[in-house]
């Protein structure tokens, strides 16, 4: 039974690129995936990103002197419908739970922008440059806005509350903090096999949630929704690689035999025997060393004495000791 999922390849690499905009943009490359899983995961994550994450938006507006959305506001060039359309574009980040009432109060000629919203410590305006309306000379504007948290899209008729003040206009609310999501699937290579998938996702947010966090939340949502379909107890199984502890070797084993400061005769004997590293030397027995050309008892005793000082000896069994190439790569990394 477990072969159904244990034999599937799992993604091992996730690269993230933000182009210097970590709060609003993220590009994510994930590979390798089983063939077909790129579209499966990309489409599912995209739908969740756009529909299911919490955000904040204006749900109703009340303007002094205005009773309904088809009115005009004295001293304002735009009509109420245009003002509402502009208000829908204002993005917020809420620092506390519950609906919050924010206001706009401005007098005189000039532009009214989202930066004029007085939100206090609980409501942060993320795009203060967003245009709301234009005031004429001697105009006076006072506007109350209700900001709430939610997910997805909520039509105006669902933002009507009981006993709300006369003149309160409910508006459509787009809560989603994700502005855009795209994904592509290309080929990935594992060894000589080239028909795996690589999933590339690009996420643009309004800044209230970072794209990498948004992707993580979406994956968590999918995981929680799918759990109910698992009708068996999952056993924690350790793989053979996990059971077999990685051996720990004495650091001296990775040193060159040149560092032993042997006599010229002994050093030349090791060179002729193609022994470069101490780890290679200690795996030789005394009998094997004595068979080396020009290698005598004096050289043997010299080497044994130095190895003893290092806590080593000839004839050691070193299971899974790295190859010469691996040793050389390790030494290069440490340089």
Swiss-Prot record:
- Enzyme Commission designation: 2.7.7.6
List the Pfam families hit by this protein, alphabetically: RNA_pol_A_bac, RNA_pol_A_CTD, RNA_pol_L
Annotated spans, Alpha N-terminal domain (alpha-NTD): 1-233
- Annotated signal sequence is none
Catalyses which reaction? RNA(n) + a ribonucleoside 5'-triphosphate = RNA(n+1) + diphosphate
Key words, A-Z? DNA-directed RNA polymerase, Nucleotidyltransferase, Transcription, Transferase
MF terms (GO), sorted A to Z: DNA binding; DNA-directed RNA polymerase activity; protein dimerization activity
Biological process (GO) annotations held by this record are: DNA-templated transcription
**Gene3D superfamilies, per database record:** 5' to 3' exonuclease, C-terminal subdomain, DNA-directed RNA polymerase, insert domain, RNA polymerase, RBP11-like subunit
Query: Per the record, GO CC terms?
Result: cytoplasm; DNA-directed RNA polymerase complex
Q: What class of enzyme is it?
A: transferase
Q: Where is this region: Alpha C-terminal domain (alpha-CTD)?
A: 249-335
Q: Which family does it belong to?
A: Belongs to the RNA polymerase alpha chain family.
As for what it does, the entry says: DNA-dependent RNA polymerase catalyzes the transcription of DNA into RNA using the four ribonucleoside triphosphates as substrates.
Subunit structure and binding partners: Homodimer. The RNAP catalytic core consists of 2 alpha, 1 beta, 1 beta' and 1 omega subunit. When a sigma factor is associated with the core the holoenzyme is formed, which can initiate transcription.
> Domain notes, please?
The N-terminal domain is essential for RNAP assembly and basal transcription, whereas the C-terminal domain is involved in interaction with transcriptional regulators and with upstream promoter elements.
Name of the molecule in the record? DNA-directed RNA polymerase subunit alpha
């Amino acid at each position: 039974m477990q072969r159904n999922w244990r034999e599937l390849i799992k993604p091992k690499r996730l690269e993230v690129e933000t182009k210097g905009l970590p709060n609003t943009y993220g590009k994510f490359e994930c590979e390798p995936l089983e063939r077909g899983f790129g579209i499966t995961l990309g489409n599912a994550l995209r739908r969740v990103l756009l529909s299911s994450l919490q955000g904040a938006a204006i749900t109703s507006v009340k303007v002094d002197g205005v009773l309904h959305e088809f009115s005009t506001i004295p001293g304002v060039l735009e009509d109420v419908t245009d003002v509402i359309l502009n208000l829908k574009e204002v993005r917020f980040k809420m620092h506390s739970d519950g609906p919050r009432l924010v206001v706009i109060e401005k007098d005189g000629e000039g532009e009214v922008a989202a930066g004029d919203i007085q939100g206090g410590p609980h409501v942060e305006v993320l795009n203060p440059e967003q245009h709301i309306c234009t005031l004429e000379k001697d105009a006076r504007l006072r506007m109350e806005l209700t900001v709430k948290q939610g997910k997805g899209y909520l039509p105006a008729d669902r933002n009507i509350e009981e006993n709300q003040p006369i003149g309160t206009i409910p508006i459509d609310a787009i809560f989603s903090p994700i502005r855009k999501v795209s994904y592509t699937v290309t080929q990935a290579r594992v060894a000589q096999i080239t028909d795996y998938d690589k999933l590339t996702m690009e996420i643009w947010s309004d800044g209230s949630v970072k794209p990498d966090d948004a992707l993580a939340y979406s994956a968590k949502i999918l995981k929680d929704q799918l759990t109910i379909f698992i009708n068996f107890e999952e056993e924690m199984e350790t793989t053979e690689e996990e059971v077999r502890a990685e051996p720990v070797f004495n650091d001296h084993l990775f040193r060159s035999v040149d560092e032993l400061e042997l006599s010229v005769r002994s050093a030349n004997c090791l060179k002729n025997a193609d022994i470069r590293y101490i780890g290679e030397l200690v795996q030789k027995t005394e009998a094997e060393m004595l068979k080396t050309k020009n290698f005598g008892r004096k050289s043997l005793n010299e080497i044994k004495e130095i190895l003893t000082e290092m806590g080593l000896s000839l004839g050691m069994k070193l299971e899974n000791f790295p190859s010469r190439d691996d040793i050389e790569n390790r030494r290069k990394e440490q340089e």
